[in-house]
């Protein structure tokens, strides 16, 4: 059994990207669904769907850059360069809306857990909300 499901999710996506997989399966939780929804909106993954065979499984279709520019080598570079867990079970990291850091000068995103649910750093700044910084994606 996994104690930190968010770290497990990020590790599964990272490993699937490195192995050039087209999709990866995750345990279905509300947090995973919302994080996948954010990653899809920001353009880091193609889509996510629920498994038809297993009701407790979430299927994430990974997104790669156009492989036509890479010749006949198959899949191009992954859209997700790095996934990093920030707040961990042993060391929680919180921030207010004025001190939310930018990832790579705004090129990446932070996913925050706020009182209004999970959202990106841009949405949290716009709504003047702080919260726990779950992870960074770029």
Swiss-Prot record:
It comes from the Eukaryota. PROSITE patterns: RIBOSOMAL_S8 (PS00053). GO terms for cellular component: chloroplast; ribonucleoprotein complex; ribosome. GO terms for molecular function: rRNA binding; structural constituent of ribosome. The keyword Chloroplast applies. Keywords: Chloroplast, Plastid, Ribonucleoprotein, Ribosomal protein, RNA-binding, rRNA-binding. Its main location: plastid. Pfam families: Ribosomal_S8 (PF00410). InterPro entries: Ribosomal_uS8, Ribosomal_uS8_CS, Ribosomal_uS8_sf. One of its GO terms (biological process) is translation. Belongs to the universal ribosomal protein uS8 family. This is Small ribosomal subunit protein uS8c. The lineage of its organism: Eukaryota, Viridiplantae, Chlorophyta, core chlorophytes, Trebouxiophyceae. The gene is rps8.
């Amino acid at each position: 059994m996994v104690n930190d499901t968010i770290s497990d999710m990020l590790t599964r996506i990272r490993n699937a990207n490195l192995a050039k997989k087209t999709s990866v399966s995750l345990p279905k939780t509300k947090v995973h669904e919302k994080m996948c929804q954010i990653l899809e909106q920001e353009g880091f993954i193609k889509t996510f769907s629920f498994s038809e065979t297993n009701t407790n499984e979430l299927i994430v279709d990974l997104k790669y850059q156009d492989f036509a520019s890479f010749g006949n080598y198959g899949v191009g570079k992954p859209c997700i360069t790095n996934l990093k867990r920030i707040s961990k079970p042993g060391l929680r990291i919180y921030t207010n809306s004025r001190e939310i850091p930018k990832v790579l000068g705004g090129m990446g995103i932070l996913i925050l857990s706020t009182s209004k649910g999970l959202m990106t750093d841009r949405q949290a700044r716009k709504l003047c909300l702080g919260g726990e910084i779950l992870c960074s994606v770029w």
